């Protein structure tokens, strides 16, 4: 007799990662193409000699450095195995059967998965112009809303909400509902942007999520952090899987913060390429929403899968999202050139 599993998980779709095809250009997972800095590699080498020991489960050194980075005390900071694990923890501490978790759609595909695993109900509010519709989200709040995700910049569309709109939204939400502002791509933003940390200081029900996977180039090590009210941070720790951020990840994150200026200067190259790719795609006849992330979004609708399959045949791997569109990571200039050549021919 097979083991009895939770029946409600049967229809739950599995997370679909970006494809890896040897020898192909991978523009599917929003990774940086640049290697870790020498100082980060040196920190990893040193930490590697101690991997026979468990990592610091309290992240004392990393939290101390993060506290300086965000100019807030360490008790306002939680560390996780990437910000995605913190998303799951936020759901776990706020929502259960009969509760609702609210977010725009299409957005980060992990949101509905972790909500359903918790037994809660995901409420997806359609985007407007590929951007979070905060007015509609405010109207969707009910007596059983427990958590709201605002992905900003939004993944996979790359758009951001106006600072004044986000502030008004936060102020309109009842204070017992937690608001998670997911800023995985914040380092790539170049237009007027919300001071989310100010919102954390002003509103105990706001928490900000950030990651070292994108601009800091540590996607393979899995480390992210949350900034929020100490009560929220303490409760996150109660549902945290011990030792899930390795000693290597912690050492690399500390070293990366020490080299933050050099690392973040690299984002300027991505932003320059983002503008070039966006302009070229628009000239080729594509609709491309304004992106503030390290990728662009092509709302191709029913042709999304066709485009992605043809791209794969050309040895360029992009990320389709059902019948909504295709997300394309900004890669190295030569990789972007290859993608643009394919896109012009396909069009």
From Swiss-Prot:
Q: Which transformation does this protein catalyse, written as a reaction?
A: an aromatic L-alpha-amino acid + 2-oxoglutarate = an aromatic oxo-acid + L-glutamate
**A biological-process GO annotation:** L-histidine biosynthetic process
| GO molecular function annotation | aromatic-amino-acid transaminase activity; histidinol-phosphate transaminase activity; pyridoxal phosphate binding
What EC number(s) has UniProt assigned to this enzyme? 2.6.1.57
Q: Which SUPFAM superfamilies match?
A: PLP-dependent transferases (SSF53383)
- Enumerate the InterPro entries for this protein: Aminotrans_II_pyridoxalP_BS, Aminotransferase_I/II_large, ArAT, HisP_aminotrans, HistidinolP_aminotransfase, PyrdxlP-dep_Trfase, PyrdxlP-dep_Trfase_major, PyrdxlP-dep_Trfase_small
Q: Which CDD domains match?
A: AAT_like
The answer to keyword Phosphoprotein applying to this record is no
Respond yes or no to whether keyword Transferase is given for this record.
Answer: yes
Positions where N6-(pyridoxal phosphate)lysine occurs in the chain = 214
Q: What keywords tag this UniProt record?
A: Aminotransferase, Pyridoxal phosphate, Transferase
Write down a Pfam family by its short name.
Aminotran_1_2
Q: Which HAMAP family match?
A: HisC_aminotrans_2 (MF_01023), Phe_aminotrans_2 (MF_01513)
Assembly description: Homodimer.
Q: What is this protein called?
A: Aromatic amino acid aminotransferase
């Amino acid at each position: 007799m097979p083991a009895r599993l939770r029946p409600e998980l049967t229809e739950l779709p599995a997370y679909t990662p970006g494809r890896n095809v040897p020898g192909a250009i991978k523009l599917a997972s929003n990774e940086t193409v640049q290697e870790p800095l020498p100082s980060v590699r040196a920190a990893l080498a040193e930490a590697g000699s101690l991997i026979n020991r468990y990592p610091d489960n309290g992240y004392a050194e990393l939290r101390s450095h993060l506290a300086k980075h965000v100019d807030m005390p360490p008790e306002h900071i939680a560390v996780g195995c990437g910000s995605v694990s913190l998303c799951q923890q936020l759901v776990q501490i706020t929502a259960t059967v009969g509760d609702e978790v609210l977010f725009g759609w299409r957005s980060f595909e992990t949101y509905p998965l972790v909500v359903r695993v918790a037994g809660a109900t995901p409420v997806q509010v359609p985007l407007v112009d590929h951007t979070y519709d905060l007015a509609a989200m405010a109207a969707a709040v009910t007596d059983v809303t427990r958590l709201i995700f605002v992905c900003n910049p939004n993944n996979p569309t790359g758009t951001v909400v106006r600072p004044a709109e986000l502030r008004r939204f936060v102020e309109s939400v009842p204070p017992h509902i937690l608001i998670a502002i997911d800023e995985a791509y914040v380092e790539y933003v170049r237009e007027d942007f919300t001071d989310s940390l100010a919102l954390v200081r002003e509103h105990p029900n706001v928490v900000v999520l950030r990651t070292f996977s994108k601009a800091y180039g540590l996607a393979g090590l899995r480390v992210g952090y949350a900034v929020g009210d100490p009560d929220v941070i303490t409760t996150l720790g109660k549902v945290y899987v011990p030792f899930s951020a390795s000693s290597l990840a912690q050492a690399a994150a500390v070293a990366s913060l020490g080299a933050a200026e050099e690392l973040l200067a690299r984002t300027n190259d991505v932003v320059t390429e983002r503008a070039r790719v966006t302009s070229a795609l628009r000239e080729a006849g594509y609709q491309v929403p304004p992106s503030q992330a390290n990728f662009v979004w092509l709302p191709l609708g029913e042709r999304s899968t066709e485009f992605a399959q043809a791209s794969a045949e050309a040895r360029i791997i992009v990320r389709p999202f059902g019948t909504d569109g295709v997300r394309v990571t900004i890669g190295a200039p030569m990789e972007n050139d290859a993608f643009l050549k394919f896109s012009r021919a396909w069009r």
